[in-house]
Amino acid sequence: MQGALQNLAAVIAMRTNVGRMNEILDAPLQTGSEQLTNQGCDIVFDHVGFAYNSGETVLRDVSFTAKQGEVTALVGPSGGGKTTVSRLAARFWDYQKGSITVGGMEVSQIDPEKLMSLYSIVFQDVTLFDNTILENIRLGRKGATDEEVLAAAKLANCEEFAEKLPDKWNTNIGENGCALSGGERQRISIARAFLKDAPIILL
């Protein structure tokens, strides 16, 4: 009976993963021709409206400016669209109404790869790999030295848990960081963002 339930769970997980993969493959290819110019990194939402493909409206007539060099915090209830705002700024999705600019440039007109170079993103559902703490953080900037990785890790307070582990920074954390707590996984995500050292951090 237990084996059957495990097989059922595996089938459900496989169907979920296939569904997510199909969503990615079916998504339209994003394009953008404008190269980045040195106009700062202010993020401006001007009367932005956004709804998911299901028709659910998430944002309606949203306007604000996140100034370069300042911390901008969005406060609201769970499900209020705070995460959606950061994803739209990074163009994970395209908005239907209004305008979003970074440094005066419309995000939909910027080459996606160039746009992403502006952002370090701390995901709530961080993806970790069956590797060491150091190597998981190094994904923030491939080619970074151990010293650079450790500096970013300590800035994110990863040493509070890493130094207590059997192999410290070289401890293997298991698939998706199963050996760590949720808070510890989040700190690795923050360390990655610090290591990338992009002009804008989205939390």
Predicted segments, located by residue:
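Cytosolic ends of transmembrane helices, especially the final helix of ABC transmembrane type-1 domains
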Residues: 1-24
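General structural signal for alpha-helix termini and helix-helix connectors
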Residues: 3, 7, 30-31, 47, ...
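Pre-NBD coupling/linker segments of ABC/ABC-like ATPases
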Residues: 25-38
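ABC-type nucleotide-binding domain
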Residues: 38-203
